[in-house]
A protein has these predicted regions:
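Acidic/His-rich, divalent-metal-binding segments that scaffold phosphate/diphosphate chemistry
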Residues: 2-121, 161
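Generic detector of well-ordered alpha-helical segments enriched in charged/polar residues
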Residues: 18-26, 34-38, 152, 178, ...
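Generic secondary-structure transition motif, activating predominantly at the C-termini of alpha-helices
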Residues: 22-29, 41-45, 52, 155, ...
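Residue-level signal for secondary-structure boundary elements
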Residues: 29-33, 45-49, 142, 163, ...
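Solvent-exposed, flexible loop/coil residues
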Residues: 52-55, 61, 65, 69-70, ...
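Divalent metal-dependent catalytic cores for phosphoryl transfer on phosphate-bearing substrates
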Residues: 57, 78-198
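Acidic, carboxylate-rich catalytic segments that either coordinate divalent cations
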Residues: 173-230
Length: 230
């Protein structure tokens, strides 16, 4: 899969990438999180192959939502190797579900591109709707209330600051890590998209999503390399 996609209607994602999620979920030792995350993911996996992660910003391409969340899951696995005191099942649960309600937030056509926000997307937004999805599934499954609450908090706080849409700031380690990794993946995508068309030593135009910065292509990296999500 290549970030600098010339064809915004194809990411190269396929059903096997949703299978990776189920393998990840089935490896959880926490049975409550395994059932909860597995249920919600299974109900939405067909949409994930098509849905973009944004209307206009990062990963605003067909399958971009799956691409973005899969990137974060991979990053979470690396973080947990370095920091063994992190609750891996909880962090991965938040990574898999943090943007799941974007399947409700956007109106998406056959091309897999968002053509606007749904009524629910405008009035409620994907953070709150995601927490609502967790609560509804948890109630049906009889999920442990503490685990339900922690996962809801991770979804509600993953934008980091209220000015960026967070309902609350991250208040425990796994929530903080999810917020930082979400931001990192979005910015890597945006910067890579900005510099790939540029010649060496050129600057992009000012990018609103990157604090109105102009991004520099130093020319030392191979921007044509694919993102490794397999």
């Amino acid at each position: 899969m290549h970030y600098a996609l010339r064809n915004r209607t194809s990411t190269g994602l396929k059903l096997s990438h949703t299978g990776f999620y189920m393998e990840t979920i089935n490896a959880f030792s926490d049975e409550d999180l395994k059932k909860l995350v597995g249920t919600i993911f299974t109900e939405n996996k067909e949409k994930l192959l098509k849905w973009p992660a944004a209307y206009k910003l990062h990963h605003a391409i067909r399958g971009g939502l799956l691409m973005h969340t899969l990137s974060i899951v991979k990053l979470c696995e690396g973080v947990c190797e370095v920091y063994p005191f992190v609750d891996k099942d909880l962090l991965l649960s938040g990574a898999i579900l943090h943007d799941i309600a974007k399947t409700l937030e956007f109106n998406v056509g056959e091309t897999g591109l968002a053509n606007g926000y749904s009524v629910e997307g405008n009035l409620i937004g994907h953070l709150v709707m995601g927490a609502m999805m967790v609560r509804e599934a948890a109630d049906k499954l009889g999920t442990d209330k503490k685990r339900e609450m922690l996962l809801e908090h991770m979804i509600l706080s993953h934008h980091g600051e209220p000015e960026f849409g967070a309902a609350v700031r991250p208040l425990f380690l796994e929530a903080e890590l999810l917020s930082e990794l979400d931001l990192m993946d979005a910015r890597v995508y945006q910067i890579h998209e900005a510099i790939t068309p540029l010649k060496e030593d050129d600057f992009s135009g000012r990018l609103w999503a990157l604090d109105n910065r102009k991004i520099y292509n130093h020319g030392l990296a191979d921007n044509k390399k694919d993102v490794d999500l397999d």
